[in-house]
Design a protein with these regions (language model features):
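C-terminal motif of bacterial Sec signal peptides marking the signal peptidase cleavage site
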Residues: 18-22
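Short glycine-/acidic-enriched loop or helix-start segments at secondary-structure transitions
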Residues: 55-57, 122-124, 159
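Extended ligand-binding regions for polar small-molecule ligands
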Residues: 24-25, 76-85, 138-177
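Bacterial N-terminal signal peptides that target proteins for export
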Residues: 1-12
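Acidic, polar ligand-binding/catalytic clefts
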Residues: 24-29, 93-154
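Extracytoplasmic small-molecule ligand-binding "clamshell" domains
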Residues: 30-115
């Protein structure tokens, strides 16, 4: 009687493995497909001016649109490097943090940068990366910097965090190499 039970259990286990394999279950996932949309496409980035991190030269269009050569800074360089890794073009929009968060929520932006700290008030509305560096800001205090992305788009955020870790020399545990 035990042998048929073991055979049945093995058959169920094998069937379960086949079903899960057929589902192509990938973790982490992006419910809205942000990473897939950006790869080989366009990375839509919202930038709020913050000296050294995001600098903007010239006129900003009425919808916040700027040409690629109008934006510079350390975070702009990080974003451009990430886009290169994904084979994507970068499209920048300049606005306030609040407006950028609104645009991420509505799906018209993939990422927001601009000296945003880990104490950001936006974490209940959008996804926040792990801190990727620590800097002293104008208040004289150390702050951990993060980037903002669509809430729940974990594959996109994970890929961004891996890029930031590689560029900044961090390991998964957050320590330098």
């Amino acid at each position: 009687m035990r042998r048929p039970l073991r055979t049945a259990a093995a058959a169920v286990a094998a069937a379960l493995v086949m079903v899960l394999s057929a589902c192509s279950l990938h973790v982490p996932t992006d419910p809205d497909g942000t990473l897939d949309a950006v790869q080989g496409g366009t990375l839509r980035v919202g930038a709020t001016p913050h000296a050294g991190f995001v600098d903007v030269a010239g006129q900003v269009g009425p919808d916040g649109a700027v040409s690629d050569d109008q934006v510079s800074g350390s975070e702009v360089d990080l974003v451009r490097g990430f886009a290169r890794e994904l084979g994507a073009e970068v499209e920048f929009v300049v606005s306030s943090e609040g407006e950028l968060v609104r645009r991420i929520e509505e799906g018209s932006l993939d990422l927001a940068v601009g000296g945003i700290t880990s104490k950001s008030p936006w974490s209940s509305k959008v996804g926040v990366t792990r801190p990727y560096t620590e800097v002293v800001l104008s208040d004289g205090k150390k702050h951990k910097l993060v980037m903002l992305a669509p809430m729940g788009e974990n594959a996109f955020i994970s890929e961004l965090e891996r890029h930031l870790d590689r560029v900044t020399g961090k390991t998964q545990a957050g320590e330098g190499r």
